[in-house]
């Protein structure tokens, strides 16, 4: 029997890179709320006592960047100088400028349906039937752990927790089927007055056990809870944070390939984001239709050109029809031009800040997670 291990990691909303992602997407949402046709590319840098927000924007909207930044940091939980970062006292620098007219010229069209891609690039979408949400299990449960850390921090169950945390889960597979969890790593920032033994017990009882299915845990499962023994200094005081540095956490935890483009701070004309969402939508509908157990779709674009330069599909030997048939079905049922996918998924609206922590995929509140095309795909495939 073929056995293997596979590991994915996640980080909490208080991780420095995720603070940056959330600020970038908060700015994007605030602009889209006033101007759905805005062009936004917003990058954020955070370090002890400061936030730098930069990028390129073309819009009729006005947004109070400083107030928005402070509000976002406050909601995450950095509200005291003891943590090395305080929403009310940190410096906020605004370096946002206008998008190049050369890019506008390539993207905008008299007929909006012929809108060109905002850049060249390649994007991947993936789905697998190993979980109910058609996502790989390692990233799904890595997200669930840090999301739970945030919940018990905010509701007072574990009041000594602080916002920065990381998780990592290693699953054991036999013949590509899950047989158990081999190892769990959870590192969480904490106040200085909690003993290591109490922290380990609290994390195990209030975070790990409520989240991970008992049937996958065994006496051989290894647990690493704050393995350095101390994690008081964290967040932007521990490390600087940048938008777009957690692209594997944001997607499939390494289980699928990645085109390299980050998501946060980008409006839907940027195919790095919108086409990756559409590719997930396509792959998920193919798996939901029963046309494959696993599906990875690649799509690519040229700047200023509407039609994708390529579409390819890999089903890892699990396809019920050929990959040529699947590509034909994709072209028939999904409009992957930039305008088409924005319309198909209703992307020109302020829905992005919620994506910026705990993964962009596998969360049914987002439109790219719908499986409304599955029935038609199955019928047209003749199954």
Swiss-Prot record:
NCBIfam families from the UniProt entry: metK
Whichever gene encodes this chain, its name is metK
Looking up SUPFAM superfamilies in the UniProt record yields:
S-adenosylmethionine synthetase
Where in or outside the cell it occurs: the entry states:
Cytoplasm
Please spell out the taxonomic lineage of the organism that makes this protein.
Bacteria, Pseudomonadati, Pseudomonadota, Gammaproteobacteria, Alteromonadales
Q: Write out the pathway annotation from the protein's UniProt entry.
A: Amino-acid biosynthesis; S-adenosyl-L-methionine biosynthesis; S-adenosyl-L-methionine from L-methionine: step 1/1
Recorded hits in PANTHER family, A to Z, give: S-ADENOSYLMETHIONINE SYNTHETASE
Keyword annotations: ATP-binding, Cytoplasm, Magnesium, Metal-binding, Nucleotide-binding, One-carbon metabolism, Potassium, Transferase
Q: Which reaction does this chain catalyze?
A: L-methionine + ATP + H2O = S-adenosyl-L-methionine + phosphate + diphosphate
The entry marks the following residues as binding ATP, namely: 15, 164-166, 230-231, 239, 245-246, 262, 266
Could you name the Gene Ontology cellular component terms for this entry? cytoplasm
Q: Which cofactor does it need?
A: Mg(2+); K(+)
Q: Entry cofactor note text?
A: Binds 2 divalent ions per subunit. Binds 1 potassium ion per subunit.
Region (Flexible loop) residue spans: 99-109
| Protein name stated in the entry | S-adenosylmethionine synthase
Oligomeric state and interaction partners are given as:
Homotetramer; dimer of dimers.
